Amino acid sequence: MSETSPNNLTESADITEITQLILRERESRDLARWETMRECFWPDSLIRVSWFRGNGPDFVTGSIEMARRGIPAKHRLAPILVRLAGDRAIASLHGIIDLPVVLKGIRATLSTHSRFLYRAEKREGAWGLMGFDAIYMRDELTPDLPGQVITISPEETKDFRRSYRLLSYYLHSQGYKVDSNLPGEDVPETVDVLYRELFGWCGIPIPK
């Protein structure tokens, strides 16, 4: 039996509930269903992404403000893998964050490829999210109209990490402070540190 195969009906039900919890949280973010999104997080959860670090409820408040400012992120999600350990679990999936942007006067879509890692915990019989982290892989910028070109010089992005360089560049232009020490494939040791933290919290070995 593999580490991710459920051993009984209870584990299968837990995995299904966690999967639906994550999908509900991301759908609520995309569709501005803010109270539903808020209900997905435990109050003492920890969220660490490019533009935000804090608890889940405050993350929702920040997302509301981001949407109000005209930065409506949408998410493309791959299948979710849940690793269960009693009342705790880690879920991972590949995700692409799409942001409609205007840069240098040209409308485009900024797409950031990441691996999302969620921590979930069951309390009083219900699962809630305890954490959300992203491992940044790469990003890309696609103008809305074929043939248009957005020119960004190396000098403009020299202070930003390669794995989320364009995202950092855009968020910085919108007044956001971006953490330059987040987990990313361009600095493998940052990924190793995150995996040790999350899998240690869950009490299960890191996959090999």
Protein language model features and the residues they cover:
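A solvent-exposed, acidic/Ser-Thr-rich amphipathic alpha-helical stretch
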Residues: W34-L99, L198
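Hydrophobic/aromatic beta-strand elements that line small-molecule binding cavities or substrate pockets
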Residues: L77-V82, R115-E121, A134-I135
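Short, glycine/acidic-rich beta->alpha junctions
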Residues: E17, K74, L110-H113
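Charge-dense, low-complexity intrinsically disordered segments
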Residues: N8, S12, S50, R107
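Terminal "cap-and-tail" regions of soluble proteins that handle hydrophobic small molecules
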Residues: S2-T19, A126-K208
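Exposed beta-sheet edge and beta->alpha loop/turn motif
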Residues: R88-E124, R138-F160
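Conserved catalytic-core segments centered on acid/base and nucleophilic motifs
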Residues: E27-S28, C40, Y118-E121
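Short, aromatic-enriched amphipathic alpha-helices that serve as compact interaction elements
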Residues: D14-D30
